[in-house]
Amino acid sequence: MSLTLTPSRQLPEVDAFIQCAMVMEAQPFLDALVPLPGSHAVETLVVGADGHHQQSYALGQLEGHTVVVITSGIGIANAAAAVARGLTLATPKIVIAGGTAGGLEGGIQVGDIAGAISTIYNDADATVFGYELGQIPRMPVDYHSSQRAIDALAGLNDAQPHHVRTGRIVTGDSFASEKVVARIRAGFPDALAVDMETCGMAQVCWSNGVDWICLRAISDLTGEGADEDFHMNGEKAAYHSFEAICAYLSLFCK
């Protein structure tokens, strides 16, 4: 038997990966998936040891688009690992972060869609070595969506019922309590929203030359009281993201 680290086959192409942290966020997509033509069921792969953290991949069609719905688990490492593994299974035209996020910028409202086209880590600090706040050493300052991905956002407000705000989302592994939000706002005053996954996903996409965008619904406004209250039911916010992503796919893939 010969040993090789070279991929032995051409990876199938799909329209999109849709990365969600939690089953609650992924469920609207999973409910809407139908089998690919010629298949009898949606193909599902679960990776991870029994009794430990597991990540799932569901391949099917979503309103005519071939997608892989990835349920990664919460946090930067889980999102990065899940998308990196996904890229060994298929080649997407774009990776879309779905689900929920916390609103930061004053004009964003609960239920709005954070159409994030740039992202940076909110808790990375290598400034002592001359890097920008939020920048990982030897990586870009932040990560940006392509012009094609940005252009597809232009019609999204008219294509679905939720208001879309375009800007930057910041990512960290700390829940957005009042203390954490004060630090984030001081360091990243232009940030639209905060989550725990998008930048990890975007870094993997950048490393592999794959496009990405984030279309998360705002479930709460961060800061005072954020550790006690969600201002919109999580399932409802996740459905807002689902509706926005379905509409976006039609705009991006046309």
Label each residue range with its predicted role.
Residues 82-90:
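Short, well-structured alpha-helical segments in soluble
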Residues 100, 104-188:
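Mid-sequence, gly/pro-rich, charge-dense loop/helix-turn segments that line enzyme active sites
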Residues 91-96:
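Proline-aspartate-enriched helix->loop->beta-strand connector
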Residues 223-254:
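His/Asp/Glu-rich mid-to-C-terminal helical/loop segments that flank catalytic regions of hydrolases
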Residues 2-81:
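N-terminal short beta-loop-beta anion/metal-coordinating cradle
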